[in-house]
């Protein structure tokens, strides 16, 4: 591991940044990513992209964090805890997708980096989180940089611009 990728000495596990939504119901987003990372022995650094108001039956509100706040979170981690991988979830806005894309490029200039894009475009209950600008940002900025993309069938159709009535 080169100096640009070296984690703080007190962290012996591989570092993964999860840039996703905070699910107040605890079933998805950063909560689920934290459980998955722990199961695989990874050190997860959660970066809050959006805050949701939701429970087990639905989502009542989604509030993306500002691009400045997202950038501040990434800059703090980038200065001290560089990742070997980034996993995205609910990003909430085209501006925030652009911030993530810039950080991926910046980190890859220093060392290899895997990017797993889970393009959360809506809730499992059907509520949509993504407008045309978000879809365009995914297509132009994140998907070309992705190592792996993990959409569900509905998200895949929206990302490739197939008629959503085929659900």
Where are these regions (language model features)?
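Conserved phosphate/ATP/ADP-binding segment of small-molecule kinases
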Residues: 128-167
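Active-site beta-loop-alpha junctions enriched in small/polar residues
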Residues: 91, 120-122, 154
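A short helix->loop->beta-strand "cap" motif at the edges of active sites that frequently abuts
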Residues: 107-115
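Conserved phosphate-binding/catalytic loop of the ribokinase/pfkB sugar-kinase fold
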Residues: 61-72, 106, 123-143
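Short Gly/Thr/Asp-enriched flexible loops that form oxyanion-binding sites at enzyme active sites
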Residues: 95-106
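Small-residue (G/A/S/T)-rich helix-start motifs and N-terminal tracts that mark the onset
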Residues: 1-85, 162-167
């Amino acid at each position: 591991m080169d100096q640009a990728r070296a984690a703080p000495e007190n962290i012996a596990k591989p570092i993964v940044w999860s840039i996703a939504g905070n699910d107040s119901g605890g079933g998805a987003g950063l909560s689920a990513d934290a459980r998955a990372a722990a199961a695989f022995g990874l050190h997860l650094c959660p970066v809050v992209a959006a805050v949701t108001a939701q429970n087990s039956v639905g989502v009542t509100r989604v509030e993306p964090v500002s691009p400045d706040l997202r950038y501040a979170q990434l800059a703090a981690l980038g200065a001290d805890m560089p990742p070997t991988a980034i996993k995205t979830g609910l990003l909430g806005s085209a501006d925030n997708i652009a911030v993530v894309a810039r950080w991926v490029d910046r980190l890859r200039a220093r060392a290899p980096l895997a990017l797993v894009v889970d393009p959360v475009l809506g809730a499992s209950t059907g509520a949509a989180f993504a407008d045309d600008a978000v879809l365009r940002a995914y297509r132009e900025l994140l998907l070309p940089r992705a190592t792996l993309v993990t959409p569900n069938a509905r998200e895949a159709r929206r990302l490739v611009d197939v008629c959503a009535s085929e659900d």
